[in-house]
Curated annotation (Swiss-Prot):
Recorded topology in the membrane: Multi-pass membrane protein
NCBIfam families xref list: PRK01318.1-3, yidC_nterm, yidC_oxa1_cterm
Membrane-traversing stretches: 350-370, 424-444, 461-481, 498-518
Cellular localization per UniProt: Cell inner membrane
Record note on quaternary structure: Interacts with the Sec translocase complex via SecD. Specifically interacts with transmembrane segments of nascent integral membrane proteins during membrane integration.
Keyword Transport: yes
Keywords: Cell inner membrane, Cell membrane, Chaperone, Membrane, Protein transport, Transmembrane, Transmembrane helix, Transport
Gene giving rise to this polypeptide: yidC
GO (cellular component) term, any one: plasma membrane
Family of this protein: Belongs to the OXA1/ALB3/YidC family. Type 1 subfamily.
GO process annotations (BP): protein insertion into membrane; protein transport
Name this polypeptide is given: Membrane protein insertase YidC
Amino acid sequence: MDFKRLTAFFAIALVIMIGWEKMFPTPKPVPAPQQAAQKQAATASAEAALAPATPITVTTDTVQAVIDEKSGDLRRLTLLKYKATGDENKPFVLFGDGKEYTYVAQSELLDAQGNNILKGIGFSAPKKQYTLNGDTVEVRLSAPETNGLKIDKVYTFTKDSYLVNVRFDIANGSGQTANLSADYRIVRDHSEPEGQGYFTHSYVGPVVYTPEGNFQKVSFSDLDDDAKSGKSEAEYIRKTPTGWLGMIEHHFMSTWILQPKGGQSVCAAGDCHIDIKRRSDKLYSASVSVPLAAIQAGAKAETAVNLYAGPQTTSVIANIADNLQLAKDYGKVHWFASPLFWLLNQLHNIIGNWGWAIVVLTIIVKAVLYPLTNASYRSMAKMRAAAPKLQTIKEKYGDDRMAQQQAMMQLYKDEKINPLGGCLPMLLQIPVFIGLYWALFASVELRQAPWLGWITDLSRADPYYILPIIMAATMFAQTYLNPPPTDPMQAKMMKIMPLVFSVMFFFFPAGLVLYWVVNNLLTIAQQWHINRSIEKQRAQGEVVS
């Protein structure tokens, strides 16, 4: 069948792409001398802009944060409950400003002309080490009075949370009305997290959600184009009364929340202005400017915005802000992957183990598809039973392909066989496979989630390749249950396919391979039962419908 040939070709192409990516990863381009000089200048500029002062360390049960005392920037954020991708002996570091990469959260107050009112003036804190002992820990950074304004920046960390409240306390002693705005930014370079590959690649970059534009990704490449052209043409909403924005990467995110779920928007004094760009220092910035109500002489005011910097745990982020769960990158199949993960999550809540939840989900999906797949498998079983007659036709007509095809079509008609009926089971599984792939790949809930024995992380490949080998065995078993192709070349290809798919699945998440193994076992049981039933009917001389 042409479909089988196409499937085999597709599978081999996938393996070639995976193998090439693994053995010959795309090298990073070596900059030309002029480009290298420009890069060094840009790096020097970036280091000057982010020059560290005395660090302030904050430790809670979930994070260890490092705040730059002078600028008040959040320079480093370690997620203590998550292991590093490449080294399970170390915790995962989200923010950092070292030699490896730059990824920080910044905030400042601007005057009516858009200038930082504390430029060149540093904050100070009463101590350098803070540890969570109760429900919250507060870090107050105070700046000397400037132009009659007394400003404090206050970080509040909460127990068992990745939500950080960043607040400015302002006392206006200038003798005149102060018209200010607060600017909140996420700044990072374009480096990708460790573990990104051809089939394990997730979006990295700025995102924004607004009621006007819904969820939008703003790619680094679009921002590069804007920087080269000097225009601002990247597609995103620039003025909004509410929403959120920031940066995402595989499993993790950092976003400024303009309106907490069920709360008031910080844009109450006027629309917030969003600016996503590549800066002159080659760093990328996702920022929002929040206008403040006029502060009268002698009055005090405060403005606070929540920063969520942590894992993309659906049950958590969905309760922080409207549609924040859209930051979980399901690619272009969100419409299918999201409900699949919802069902998987419900099963996990009942069973308590993500691996067994995948097994039960597979059984449910198989049961839902049963009415459709059953007819197709019966067609395949009838094709298998008619194989001797097909071989007779082939021997009778030899090289006369036209007569051979006519005789085969007449046989299909007499035996009530649909020669394309066997394609349907695989076609039906393709959207499920793709949706479940993204549901498992994108969901941080499965990161470090064990199943049993050697499977200690369902989001990563089987370390000993046991599941892919089992999957190959089940695929070999299926080839003997299905009707043999009449074309010798196709027959050889169908025997090679199990090996091809098993190699491909070496690099897939163990949770996905588990789904495929269970699905194959159920398919084998179903096909075996149907084959036995049809063979029994033929042996008894009954008409097979």
